[in-house]
Amino acid sequence: MEVAFDIRNFSVYYGNKVGIRNVNLEIYRNKVTAIIGPSGCGKSTLLRSLNRLIELVDGVRIEGEVIFDGKNIYDDGVDAVELRRRIGMVFQHPNPFPKSIFDNVAYGPRVHGIKDKERLKEIVEESLKKAALWDEVKDRLSDSALGLSGGQQQRLCIARAIATNPEVILFDEPTSALDPIAAAKIEELMVELKKNYTVVVVTHNIQQAARISDYVAFFWMGELVEYGKTAKVFEKPEKELTEKYLTGRVG
């Protein structure tokens, strides 16, 4: 299997506080990898390290390497803006721009230099289709994105991430603000997206991780406790702490 990210001896510190410590992990291409663990265990810290968003936090210090496409993304000379084009992100709360549905999706391609109107139309349609939203919005692309439901807004944010033609899409608790029906649509979509993208998702929802992921990483107090194929980790975890967390006895 091809490796998307090779994370080596990777640590993140917020001042004197440990975010994550000495993480070694391979994340595979065209798979869904779930990162689970209790609040404050380092899940989102790791996720935001994969496209260098973590650097935007004041006082953060980073050690170790994240190898993506043969290079350490933290090396001097790596263009963080281009990296974030290749590694898209969808956040916990839908955050559409106060613009039209069309302009939300076209925003990234325009920033990256695509000006041709026909090409932009193609990208918008293709991205909305991949985000399973096209049929619901195709007749109102000029309407404000803020008029969409929460679930539709989240799928719009996924379309916006897709529009820059990334290789990886990171999801940070993407369904926690949604009702169960909208959440189920996002879950289906994440599984579908792995055909074309590498998907990494942080989730508090253990059942969600079991349903959608191929691989699962369990974090506890900033450390990676266990990582492996989801079926194996859930059915026969190697570590007692993993088993206790999955059965609700700690966490």
From Swiss-Prot:
It is an enzyme of class 7 (translocase). The keyword Metal-binding does not apply. It is found in: Cell membrane. One of its GO terms (biological process) is phosphate ion transmembrane transport. Its EC number is 7.3.2.1. It holds the Pfam family ABC_tran. It comes from the Archaea. Keywords: ATP-binding, Cell membrane, Membrane, Nucleotide-binding, Phosphate transport, Translocase, Transport. Part of the ABC transporter complex PstSACB involved in phosphate import. Responsible for energy coupling to the transport system. This is Phosphate import ATP-binding protein PstB. It comes from Archaeoglobus fulgidus (strain ATCC 49558 / DSM 4304 / JCM 9628 / NBRC 100126 / VC-16). The gene is pstB.
